[in-house]
A protein has these predicted regions:
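Membrane-embedded alpha-helical bundles of multi-pass transporters/translocases
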Residues: 2-528
Length: 528
């Protein structure tokens, strides 16, 4: 068991500041869910963009965002104001994100476009608005996570802050409900005489505006009600130098590569509402309120699938702080990736064993258990990744005298965004292969609205192919990605004992610098 005796320090956040930070984190991640789940669903299933166009929009935007992250990290580390280096972006940035988020939903139905120029304009607006959203989101995302490193010097408090931040972000998963709410709002427009497709489009626009305004108000708490306590490096570095700093940091490089390898786990997140809406609710969440009353089958499956995912995620995040005090973070990380691959793979096995229909409870219950376990693994990895990246910041300061919090936490955003882009491209390739794309989706929506069954629907490539594609996407690629993710971190370069020694010495250095003395050396920990 690693030594866990880091010094306790007075420079740390108050309970009120932590509360403000968590509210802000919730608001920021609510916006992320509005776009990552709601906008993706809107582009794919409401305005019916072609599958490959959608995939390339998300992929190129995410790659561009990922490259922008270290650039933004450089700006953060060069920022010195009376509010600190992170808080200014969190005070003034959220309203800009709000405007761009709403603008992304103000688009037309691709299937209704009658001219080539009209179709090009719809795709172009989708691409431009999404790229702009990613750029504005980055301006606040890097400072928000970097704030945890400058709010406290205490290792335990920082780990606690990161864990609570991940939990707050997890609660923001309720943002996926934008799809259900939007479809409900859309049904009221349909009742007034609009076509089904136009009613759904307007329902999403109205709902997106409401969700985004609320999220922005909450997001502001992180900038307004926190305080920075740890000074950054006095030296400034170019973007190129910061890329070099990140890449030369061996433990960070291992985390970065591992995070990219497990990119396919994002497939479950970006396709979750598509699966719930089409596979379980036959294309419209409002089908839970059937003609003969409440459809208990749909409701139970929605609760099982959605509920178990969130419960598993929260459990994984919630138990990590305690487990990190008892076990090596590297071992916990590798365990979560390898064991976490199994429930993903078993989901597709259950789908095949059930003959393509896992809605009956005899299959639905074990399927939901797999969802629960995959959510727990993902929640655990989210916390571990954040804490391990924070450790890398200390490692860099100790090794080279450089503390670039913004740059290193931009790496976390880099992983998330690039992973989402890769997942979107994989998703679009599979959906494009089975024909779930463009006008075909519009035809599917009309057919389901007229009474067709999604599980047996034939869009031209074979009955049930759409359903099979969805189940494949949320299971097999994520299983492969999770298994591969353990390879880079199998021999992780920064043990917990060594990090504790490093942090103790850094605190001693800072205290000595303030007193004008030379810091005493902390004995090195023998390599394990």
């Amino acid at each position: 068991m690693a030594r866990k005796t880091a010094l306790a320090h007075g420079k740390t956040y108050t309970r009120g500041e932590m509360g403000g930070y968590m509210i802000g984190m919730f608001g920021q991640n609510l916006i992320y869910q509005i776009v990552n789940t709601g906008l993706y669903f809107y582009f794919q299933n409401v305005i019916c963009l072609p599958a490959m166009a959608l995939g390339w929009i998300f992929m190129l935007a995410r790659v561009w965002d990922a490259v922008n992250d270290p650039i933004m990290g450089t700006f953060v580390d060069r920022t010195h104001t009376r509010w600190g280096k992170c808080r200014p972006y969190l005070i003034f940035g959220p309203p800009v994100i709000m405007v761009v988020t709403i603008a992304a939903f103000l688009n037309s139905n691709y299937a209704d476009a009658t001219t080539t120029s009209g179709r090009i304009a719809i795709i172009a607006w989708a691409g431009i608005s999404y790229i702009l959203w990613g750029m504005t989101y980055t301006v606040c995302d890097i400072p928000l996570w970097g704030l945890t490193s400058v709010m406290t010097e205490d290792e335990s408090d920082r780990a606690k802050a990161l864990s609570l931040a991940r939990i707050a972000a997890g609660f923001a998963g309720v943002g996926v409900m934008i799809v259900q709410v939007a479809q409900a709002v859309g049904s009221t427009f349909e009742a007034s005489g609009l076509s089904h497709s136009e009613a759904q489009r307007r329902g999403f626009i109205v709902t997106a505006i409401g969700f985004t305004v609320l999220s922005t108000i909450l997001f502001e708490f992180a900038g307004l009600f926190t305080k920075e306590r740890v000074a950054g490096s006095e030296e400034h570095y170019t973007v190129k130098e910061n890329f070099r700093i990140m890449w030369k940091n061996l433990p960070f490089r291992q985390i970065l590569i591992s995070g990219i390898l497990r990119s396919p786990i994002q497939l479950l997140l970006i396709n979750a509402m598509t699966v719930v809406t089409y596979y379980y609710a036959n294309g419209d969440i409002m089908n839970v309120f059937g003609k003969n009353g409440l459809n208990k089958g749909i409701l139970i499956n929605m609760v099982l699938i959605g509920g178990m995912m969130f419960v598993g995620n929260f459990l994984g995040m919630g138990i990590m702080p305690g487990l990190m005090k008892r076990f090596e973070k590297k071992n916990l990380y590798n365990f979560a990736t390898l064991v976490g691959a199994l429930p993903y793979a078993f989901m597709f096995v259950l789908y095949l064993m059930a003959g393509g229909d896992v809605k009956p409870l005899v299959w639905g219950i074990p399927f939901s258990v797999c969802i629960f376990l995959s959510g727990a693994a993902q929640g655990a990895l989210n916390v571990l990744q954040s804490v391990m990246i924070a450790d890398c910041v200390d490692y860099e300061e100790y090794t080279n005298g450089i503390r670039t919090d913004g740059v290193f936490f931009s790496g976390q955003s880099f992983i998330t965004k690039l992973s989402s882009g890769i997942a979107a491209l994989i998703s679009s390739a599979v959906f494009g292969y089975v024909g779930y794309s463009g006008a075909n989706v519009d035809k599917l929506n009309d057919a389901l609205h007229a009474g067709a069954d999604f599980l047996t629907y034939d869009g031209g490539t074979g009955a049930g192919k759409y359903a099979a594609a969805m189940m494949f996407l949320i299971s097999i690629p994520p299983a492969i990605g999770m298994a591969l993710a353990a390879i880079p971190t199998w021999k992780y370069a920064l043990s917990d004992a060594e990090h504790t020694r490093i942090l103790d010495e850094l605190v001693a250095r800072r205290a000595a610098a303030e007193a004008g003395e030379e810091a005493p050396a902390v004995p090195e920990v023998p390599a394990e």
